[in-house]
Amino acid sequence: MKALGVLPVALLMVACSASEPTIEPSGQATFSSPSVAPTPTGASSATPGPSATPTPKPIKTPKPHPISVQALINKRYDGRDLKVRRLVADYGAYKRYIITYRGDGLTISGVMNVPDGKGPFPVLVLNHGYIDPDTYFPGQGMPREHDYLARHGYVVLHTDYRGHASSDNDPNADYELRLPYAVDTINAVKAVKSSKLPYLDKNRVGWLGRSMGGGVTLTALVAQPGLVDAAVIYASVSSLAADNWKQFYRPSEDRSKTNRRIARTYGLPDKSPEFWRAASARPYLDRVTEPLLVHHGTRDDTCPIRWSEATVKTLKTAGKDVTFVKYRGEGHTFDRQWRRSIERTTAFFDKHLN
């Protein structure tokens, strides 16, 4: 398997026997009046006025590290100008278009599948997993989900992220632990909601993310709670940045110059735990307000299932609406039980977006 970088995820196909997956539900101070000394006869009497109350000095909130989830929480998002650029395919049940939108000073590209019919249709913004930007093409990743969901009445908008396909480049995206990808998907939703395209239902929007895109989705959920109506993640990376670094860091990679810069600037997780925790979604999962469906295979050796188990446990402890489905024997990309998983996904979105 190809080495994957800081937070990357490669696809690994494992054929597995189908089985019924496991689903988990989801002291008081006293003040005395001042005494006044007796006034001699004939002397004028003056009534003491109230003493001035000192104005408290405002407490300054420490500015978060720019590479942190808190910085994303504080950020203002300006996704807009969703434009359909050209038709690339007509599959009968739906048409596929190249699109762009603006946000964070960048133009981001993507593809959008639009079902035939009058609409308006609910919208799903898809967040793809790690693919080398040098070989990535528009809309790459999750082709089965693209097709199935469009055929079942959903507009599917796949964001390419910055630095991918025709999107504007951001040379610091890797150095910033790919947290800017969450900015791109948040701005994709903002662009949908501000669009005048008549077939988009701005009041019914969800997120779906796979692998690295699962982590992008979790980060977006905590950065902008309430922006979408529901979310689904498949085979997600960990909600702790340190886990992902330890799993995917490969010093011998061509991209290791960035990795060395990260280690030199921020420190390794064991030496700088505060930085790595601040760059993680998990400490902020109590901010999630949307129903969440989590799919994970028990034989995933790219993103171990224990990562989703820990994420789900944290969400449940916070009282969140999360459903966890484990697929016995499935690997990272899903094989025999993919159909079952996408049917659950569609039913989940049908429930929460309709």
Residue ranges and their predicted role:
Residues 13-15:
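C-terminal motif of bacterial Sec signal peptides marking the signal peptidase cleavage site
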Residues 198-211:
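Alpha/beta-hydrolase fold nucleophile elbow
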Residues 73-118:
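N-terminal cap/lid segment of alpha/beta-hydrolase-fold proteins
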Residues 218-269:
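Hydrolase active-site cap/lid region
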Residues 119-121, 126-168, 240-241:
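Short substrate-entry loop that stabilizes the transition state in hydrolases
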Residues 306-354:
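C-terminal catalytic histidine-bearing segment of alpha/beta-hydrolase fold enzymes
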Residues 288, 294-296, 300:
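Short beta-strand/loop motif that positions the catalytic acidic residue
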